[in-house]
A protein has these predicted regions:
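Phosphate/pyrophosphate-binding catalytic cores of soluble transferases and nucleic-acid-acting enzymes
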Residues: 1-253
């Protein structure tokens, strides 16, 4: 396949209108959309992740929307492999594809590739998650600091997913996680073009407030309540869900 294929990535903050723009462009170009919003992968997370509506999904073919369960073990490495396989297949008939979503790491995995890591036995991850759930974020932060100070100084220390990912690699290989991070860009059969959406802060905040109000009206509280038994899952440690879990437990007002 010659490198005359184009992937258009539409990026921007939550609530700015990425979905609507992606659908508008996809219709004009007669093409399909791939989501890289890691929260929208999960079929149990509906209201709180604002996926495209049923009518929007019918208007344009979407991929990676509600294709996984919160009980599946799924990470950016799995996504990269599945998405690149699909993209190569779609490019047999299409010259342009649309990538949209707010998860920058997942978008980067498609456009540039991510470092290769060994397959980790599920029991190691489960043990670390249990450790995090029982002892809290500070414990795994300190563990990472002791085992890989370089990555500790680079990672978002509030992102438990990334800390656990690093710790499982360290535990399985006996090597620092930072040693695996070569940041070497992978060869792709397509060119990537990025559209970053922006708007005035006040206007964006008003949109987000309206969006949250709509979620509440649609039954977000009920959706989160039905997922309460699974709040220990890393997938549910996300904005819009963890706040309700804290509310249910009397930890916030």
């Amino acid at each position: 396949m010659r490198k005359n294929k184009n992937l258009i990535y539409i990026a921007g903050p939550t609530g700015i209108g990425k979905t609507n723009l992606s659908i508008e462009i996809a219709k004009k170009l007669n093409t399909e959309i791939l989501s890289c919003d890691s929260r929208q992968f999960y079929k149990e997370l509906n209201i709180g992740t604002s996926p495209p509506s049923y009518s929007q999904l019918n208007d344009v073919k979407h991929h990676f929307i509600h294709n996984k369960s919160i009980h599946d073990i799924y990470n950016v490495g799995n996504y990269e492999k599945e998405a690149i396989t699909l993209i190569n297949k779609l490019f047999e008939d299409k010259d342009v594809l649309i990538l949209v979503g707010g998860s920058g790491l997942y978008a980067d995995s498609i456009m540039y590739g991510i470092d290769e890591f060994p397959e980790i036995p599920t029991n190691i991850r489960e043990s670390l998650i249990n450790e995090y759930n029982s002892s809290g974020l500070e414990l795994i932060q300190n563990k990472l600091k002791k085992l890989d100070i370089k990555y500790y100084n680079e990672v978002d220390l509030n992102n438990s997913n990334r800390i656990i990912r690093a710790l499982e690699i360290i535990e399985f290989t006996g090597k620092e996680f930072s040693l695996f991070r070569t940041k070497k860009q992978k060869e792709r059969v397509f060119q990537s073009q990025v559209i970053v959406m922006e708007c005035e802060r006040e206007k964006l905040y008003n949109r987000i407030n309206t969006r949250v109000d709509n979620m509440i009206e649609k039954g977000l509280e009920k959706e989160v309540l039905e997922l309460r038994d699974f709040k220990h899952l890393n997938t549910l440690n996300t904005v819009g869900y963890k706040e309700f879990f804290n509310y249910f437990e009397g930890k916030s007002n």
